[in-house]
From Swiss-Prot:
Database matches in HAMAP family: Phe_tRNA_synth_alpha1 (MF_00281)
UniProt: Mg(2+) binding residues: 264
Gene Ontology CC annotation, any one: cytoplasm
Record's protein name: Phenylalanine--tRNA ligase alpha subunit
Pfam (any one): Phe_tRNA-synt_N
PANTHER family: PHENYLALANINE--TRNA LIGASE, MITOCHONDRIAL (PTHR11538:SF41), PHENYLALANYL-TRNA SYNTHETASE (PTHR11538)
Similarity comment text for this entry: Belongs to the class-II aminoacyl-tRNA synthetase family. Phe-tRNA synthetase alpha subunit type 1 subfamily.
Cofactor note: Binds 2 magnesium ions per tetramer.
GN (gene name): pheS
Primary enzyme class: ligase
Amino acid sequence: MDNLDQLVQQAQADFAGVSDSAQLEQAKARYLGKSGALTEQLKGLGKLPPEEKREAGAAINRAKTAIEAALEARRNALREAALLAQLAAEALDVTLPGRGAQGGGLHPVSRTLERIEMLFRSIGFIVADGPEIETDWHNFTALNTPENHPARSMHDTFYLEGRDDVLLRTHTSPVQIRTMLAHVKRHAEAAAMPEIRVIIPGRVYRVDSDATHSPMFHQVEGLWVGEKVSFADLKGVIADFLRKFFETEDLQVRFRPSFFPFTEPSAEIDVAFMSGPLKGRWLEIAGCGMVHPNVLRFGGVDPERYTGFAFGMGPDRLTMLRYGVNDLRLFFEGDLRFLSQFR
């Protein structure tokens, strides 16, 4: 009995001295394992006389119960200590300032499109829209582009697979036709047709990619049709827009004679970089001209009574000029390090 009491006390002391569960399991094995001290006591019961066996067995069971109780108590203490340590490590300092939500921002090209729309709305234009998947008729035929024109080639235009009459629009000009047809139909009973004055922002697609071109890019089409609309009106509108867009009177702008099948006469508009490595270079930002009589006819407008001008400008390139960016592709790579500068 004395030996069993000492064994229990020794086990309790060993359990109390361990610092983790692995050490506790090792201590348990020394007393309750297959070769443990208490197990050896149980094995020795068979050698005792029958009259002593019952009393010795009861004493060993009491000792085993005491050791198991000490083991479980220490196991619970270690679990609680581990939990407290984890809570302390993961504790939140409620006195620290909270993390504010990081604000997003518009894409720089979206900013430019909004600015263009705002400036043209201020002089009486409205915003129109149309499909990006267009018919060959709206994209080419109705815009006075003959069947053998190079722009119709698959090297320049994305056609839908299996269809040679459906394509991704190469410009926003098809919306001119849709707008004129709808406008003429709406005012068919009027003695005089009200003016058409619209801008058409949207994505367009061409087979092209370099520092100043992208296979997908944005374009803003402008159309003004009415009685006695002239090229002087076109130059005045464009010059006024550019001065307001760049917020300066000191702007290098030039109109170059050009050719487009849907306008006559036609011109291209160039603006010079004002800073950066490309300073002094001229960059084309728009094509423009007086709407060709054939295009007016396709739109249902009488070219003998009405004239109009149209322009198509690249807001992507205007964004390059406004922010001093030299590679158009940077706008579409999705690099937040670049885009976050424009918030």
